């Protein structure tokens, strides 16, 4: 899979409802220059965190299995996404085995997927795109651009206080850098 980042700003009409408060999100640029919407608690001291725990991702809203898209297929897609997300975040900060002191908890949701040049599609079309992209890619299939809509909350591993929120369209690379870039 080639990494691809959409150049389109995330439109408020595409917000999934996964994050509790979208009003604090502000436009920003990722280290690679891609647009993101994010909020970081101005009081957060990133230096007090030494590890990150990535919760299992979820589709939001949750799709229902069909005769075309089985529960097993949906599980394969999230398994692949989880592995890729842990690999990418683990390249930035050590992974923790669970929440706790000094740990940032990442709570991610897959909210949209696109495998074409037309831009990100709303959630309704995810199953078709995921069948062709997520599963084929997970099984070593064709090489193509895959844009993913991601919403994530970053929580304190002890208090569960929201430290940051992010909403972006990308191939889930450098998620932690998007949230907490180094100066």
Residue ranges, per PLM feature:
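Bacterial Sec signal peptide processing site at the extreme N-terminus
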Residues: 1-23
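Post-signal-peptide N-terminal segment of Sec-exported extracytoplasmic proteins
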Residues: 26-52
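N-terminal segment of the mature soluble domain
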Residues: 43-109
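A short acidic/small-residue loop/turn micro-motif
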Residues: 170-172
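A short acidic/glycine-rich loop-to-helix N-cap element
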Residues: 175-183
């Amino acid at each position: 899979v080639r990494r691809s980042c959409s150049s389109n700003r995330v439109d408020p009409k595409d917000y999934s409802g996964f994050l509790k408060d979208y009003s604090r999100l502000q436009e920003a640029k990722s280290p690679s220059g891609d647009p993101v919407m994010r909020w970081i608690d101005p009081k957060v001291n990133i230096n007090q965190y030494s590890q990150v725990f990535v919760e299992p991702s979820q589709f939001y809203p949750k799709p229902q299995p069909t005769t075309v898209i089985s529960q097993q297929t949906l599980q394969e897609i999230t398994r692949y996404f989880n592995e890729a997300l842990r690999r990418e975040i683990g390249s930035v900060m050590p992974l923790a085995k669970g929440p706790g002191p000094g740990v940032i908890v990442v709570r991610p949701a897959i909210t949209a997927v696109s495998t074409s040049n037309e831009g990100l599609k709303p959630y309704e079309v995810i199953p078709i795109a995921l069948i062709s992209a997520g599963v084929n890619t997970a099984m070593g299939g064709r090489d193509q651009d895959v844009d993913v809509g991601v919403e994530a909350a970053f929580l304190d591993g002890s208090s569960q206080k929201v430290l940051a929120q992010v909403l972006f369209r990308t191939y889930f690379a450098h998620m932690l850098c998007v949230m907490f870039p180094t100066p």
